[in-house]
């Protein structure tokens, strides 16, 4: 064994061994308990970042630990390979998205191997290959036949100059990112999947997910947004149709003083024919892209349509306004406004001088003060005719019942969730498998024409999708009749909604899934990824699983038993102000810093001499130039060091602060482990451990070893507090470093301890542990070694620590058997030099003994 720890030598050797032996390839084995450990698959952007490294290290630690427990562990990896960034990169680099993507996959695959992740590479998949997306296309056509897919017009961001649809992130300050033309809202036909048909099940089954974070479940509950309320119909004077609104607060209905409709509502459109101000307002709304998240904070604007609706219960006429806070795609595109008891309605009414009518008493029974804000709490009704004096629940029911009896109201359960629009007017995605015949009939692409293959050898102009620009691509025939293919492609969330299931049978050619393999491995035992995916990906992931279940492919209700959301990776961020006042962000690698005595940064500059402003720790990002390249760190310290730091620096679900001093600390620890094994093995062969012949000190050390095994097992397996597991191993290492190694049983005990330490560290730092296991002559490869088991007998405290005082002052601490008598304790204390010197030539007048804890000798 070489004396120095050289990770660059051992890591490549061990990785080659894993490749050649196909160590992590698995097949279904009914005789073994399975464990499916999955990290969210990466987008092949070109390089791994520290967020990836953290995510995949957590997964690998869990997978390796479960493998050592004797389970049949599946840990696959693949590539979420379609998406918009590839189109931009292709234009920039004068290539096509496919070669750019495949080059990135090859590069990042090497990076993953360099980090020593134990993946089953035989199951690797890339979602941009026809072998993958053909089954997604087939499944879509089956959903269409079941009535779960439909087409309707929907608003998109449209650049009139480029004549193309823009993704939300391509709209900068209301303008096209390429040509700066003002973006318009345009209605175009798009495909939808009926996720709303599963809304109740998606909501109710959250209660089955005991091992998902409550935050994620709450976000999904709110996103699905189930509410119970009443749908109310208003007659409108001089208008051919009625207006329908939905409210969850029918108890406030007597306080409704106006209605608001979306700018795109037919009533607003009709009113605009003779109202230039309203027409201009509608145009303004059409060209304003509003994300739902921004609705709460944006300025509320509106224009009176001139129409008057009739309140069904009071008979009063109330105005109908067009307002920018009502969206056509939500509900009916119309809302009732109760400004006395809804803050948004209150602000709008105050701005435009509309009537504010209170109908709910304050908590103390007085009339509410509405001079500053609305009263939004529930309470007892007044100013409400026959409903006066009713509390919230009674009023809800009484008003709902009356409206229903009059034929102008209906109790309804509503959902905030909208059907999933899966059409994208992009090129780099899976083609939607639908065709249109010459007579306008729309139908699924026949099975014998699947997959509809996306051409990869294309020229990108950065404006139009190549399959939209080439009229020949769309031409096909169905049953001998000319037809045109759909030129939209799938939302890339489609591919990432079922990849976890395809990993169970990536080579299967008879269908989307091999049910036997899928049902052996599924559900996923632990799924690891960022909380930013809580409502989009993780909802579609659950939805797709239920669709596949109802198609008879899987027999479980949910795709993953446990979800672990890892925290973000933070790093120091610095900038200097340029000549034009702009911020120039400087990488922390290039910052020369001064720190105070507590290690805090007080001053910083870069190599060019710029004084740097330190903004603290923030998420690693390109925008702040504070990302740390994992490859540089691996080349400097080794993969094991980077992995160990990642798992030790913070609990897995909390943010991790990147500190190179911490990386250096992890590296020093691994060097200490190496050194201890080197010194131990250099002394030659070891005798068998005789536990019955151990001294008290040896028993105490062995007790520490087995207590550490018990703690680390619990920390990794049950608690998933990996940082505390590592801390416990480090504490044990400190004790082992001080332990005597001269005697035969000292060395035998050290052998047992080091074999345990190396196995406990193996999930975290597999390369060094693989090597040290061989040096310690462990049986076989460590990859097939069992997890160490704590010896219950060894952990029993058969000795205890007694404090020895002379005249009340502590003079020594002695270890004695737990069943030692007072005489034996006194005898042992007298043998201690630190005690004996105070007893020399004096008389012991009194002895105070607290069994197992304290011996106080009073002398004089």
Curated annotation (Swiss-Prot):
GO terms for cellular component: cytosol. It holds the Pfam family Anticodon_1. Its EC number is 6.1.1.4. Keywords: Aminoacyl-tRNA synthetase, ATP-binding, Cytoplasm, Ligase, Nucleotide-binding, Protein biosynthesis. It is found in: Cytoplasm. InterPro entries: aa-tRNA-synth_I_CS, aa-tRNA-synth_Ia, Leu-tRNA-ligase, Leu_tRNA-synth_edit, M/V/L/I-tRNA-synth_anticd-bd, Methionyl/Leucyl_tRNA_Synth, Rossmann-like_a/b/a_fold, tRNAsynth_Ia_anticodon-bd. It catalyses: tRNA(Leu) + L-leucine + ATP = L-leucyl-tRNA(Leu) + AMP + diphosphate. A motif ('HIGH' region) lies at residues 42-52. GO terms for biological process: leucyl-tRNA aminoacylation. GO terms for molecular function: aminoacyl-tRNA deacylase activity; ATP binding; leucine-tRNA ligase activity. A motif ('KMSKS' region) lies at residues 619-623. Belongs to the class-I aminoacyl-tRNA synthetase family. This is Leucine--tRNA ligase. It comes from Escherichia coli O6:K15:H31 (strain 536 / UPEC). The gene is leuS.
């Amino acid at each position: 064994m070489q004396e120095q720890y050289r990770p660059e030598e051992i890591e490549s050797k061990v990785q080659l061994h894993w490749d050649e032996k196909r160590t992590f390839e698995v097949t279904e084995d009914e005789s073994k308990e399975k464990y499916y450990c999955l990290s969210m698959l990466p987008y092949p952007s070109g390089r791994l970042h520290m967020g990836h490294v953290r995510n995949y290290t957590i997964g690998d630690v869990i997978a390796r630990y479960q493998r050592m427990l004797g389970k049949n562990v599946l840990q696959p990896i693949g590539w979420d390979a379609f998406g918009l960034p590839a189109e931009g990169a292709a234009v920039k680099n004068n290539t096509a998205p496919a070669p750019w993507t495949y080059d990135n996959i090859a590069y990042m695959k090497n990076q993953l191997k360099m980090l020593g992740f134990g993946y089953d590479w035989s199951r690797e998949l890339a979602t941009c290959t026809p072998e993958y997306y053909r089954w997604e296309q087939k499944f879509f056509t089956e959903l269409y036949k079941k009535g779960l897919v439909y087409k309707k017009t929907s608003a998109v961001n449209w650049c009139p100059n480029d004549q193309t649809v823009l993704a939300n992130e391509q709209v900068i300050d209301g303008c096209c990112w390429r040509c700066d033309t003002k973006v318009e809202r345009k209605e175009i036909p798009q495909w939808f999947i009926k996720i709303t048909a599963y809304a109740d099940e998606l909501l109710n089954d959250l209660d089955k997910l005991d091992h998902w974070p409550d935050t994620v479940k709450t976000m999904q509950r709110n996103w699905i947004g189930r509410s119970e309320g009443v749908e109310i119909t208003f007659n409108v004077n001089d208008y051919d149709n009625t207006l329908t609104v939905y409210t969850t607060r029918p108890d406030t209905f007597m306080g409704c003083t106006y209605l608001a409709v979306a700018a795109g509502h037919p009533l607003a459109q009709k009113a605009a024919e003779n109202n230039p101000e309203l027409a201009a307002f509608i145009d303004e709304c059409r060209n304003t892209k509003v994300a739902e998240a921004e609705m709460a904070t944006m300025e509320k604007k509106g224009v009176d349509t001139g129409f008057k609706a009739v309140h069904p219960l009071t008979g009063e006429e109330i105005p109908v306004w067009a307002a920018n806070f009502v969206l056509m795609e939500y509900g009916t595109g119309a809302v009732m406004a109760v400004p006395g008891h809804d803050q948004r309605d209150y602000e709008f009414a105050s701005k435009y001088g509309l009537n504010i009518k209170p109908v709910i008493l304050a908590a103390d029974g007085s009339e509410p003060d509405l001079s500053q804000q609305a009263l939004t709490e529930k309470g007892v009704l007044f100013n409400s005719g026959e409903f006066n004096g009713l509390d919230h629940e009674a009023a809800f029911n009484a008003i709902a019942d009356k409206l229903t009896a009059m034929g102008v109201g209906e109790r309804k359960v509503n959902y905030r969730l909208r059907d999933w629009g899966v059409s994208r007017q992009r090129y780099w995605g899976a083609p939607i498998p639908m065709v249109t015949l010459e007579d306008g009939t729309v139908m699924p692409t026949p099975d014998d024409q699947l997959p509809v293959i996306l051409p990869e050898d294309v020229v990108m102009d950065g404006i139009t999708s190549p399959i939209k620009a080439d009229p020949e691509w769309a031409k096909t025939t169905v049953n001998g009749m000319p037809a045109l293919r759909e030129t939209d492609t799938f939302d890339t969330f489609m591919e990432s909604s079922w990849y976890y299931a395809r990993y169970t049978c990536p080579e299967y050619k008879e269908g989307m899934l091999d049910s036997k393999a899928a049902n052996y491995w599924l559900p996923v035992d632990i799924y690891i990824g960022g909380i930013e995916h809580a409502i989009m990906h993780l909802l579609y992931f659950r939805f797709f699983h239920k669709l596949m279940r109802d198609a008879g492919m899987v027999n479980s209700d949910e795709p993953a038993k446990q979800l672990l959301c890892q925290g973000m990776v933070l790093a120091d961020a610095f900038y200097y102000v340029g000549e034009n006042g702009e911020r120039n962000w400087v990488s922390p690698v290039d910052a020369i810093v001064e720190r105070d005595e507590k290690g805090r940064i007080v001053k910083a500059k870069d190599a060019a001499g710029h004084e740097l402003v330190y903004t603290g720790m923030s998420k690693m990002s390109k925008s702040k130039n504070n990302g740390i390249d994992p490859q540089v760190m691996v080349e400097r310290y080794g993969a094991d060091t980077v992995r160990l730091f990642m798992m030790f620096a913070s609990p897995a679900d909390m943010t991790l602060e990147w500190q190179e001093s911490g990386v250096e600390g992890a590296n020093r620890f691994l060097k200490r482990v190496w050194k201890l094994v080197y010194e131990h093995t250099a002394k030659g062969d070891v005798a068998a451990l005789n536990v019955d012949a151990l001294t008290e000190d040896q028993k105490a050390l062995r007790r520490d070893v087995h207590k550490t095994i018990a703690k680390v097992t619990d920390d990794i397996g049950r608690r998933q507090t990996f940082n505390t597991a590592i801390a416990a191993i480090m504490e044990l290492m400190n004790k082992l470093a001080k332990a005597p190694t001269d005697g035969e049983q000292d060395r035998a005990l050290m052998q047992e301890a080091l074999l345990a330490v190396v196995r406990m560290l193996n999930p975290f730092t597999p390369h060094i542990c693989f090597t040290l296991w061989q040096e310690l002559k462990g049986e076989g490869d460590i990859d097939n070694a069992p997890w160490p088991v704590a010896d219950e007998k060894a952990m029993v405290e058969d000795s205890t620590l007694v404090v020895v005082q002379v005249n009340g002052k502590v003079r020594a601490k002695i270890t004695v058997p737990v069943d030692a008598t007072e005489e034996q304790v006194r005898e042992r204390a007298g043998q201690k030099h630190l005690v004996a010197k105070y007893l020399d030539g004096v008389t012991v007048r009194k002895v105070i003994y607290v069994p197992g804890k304290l011996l106080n000798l009073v002398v004089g």
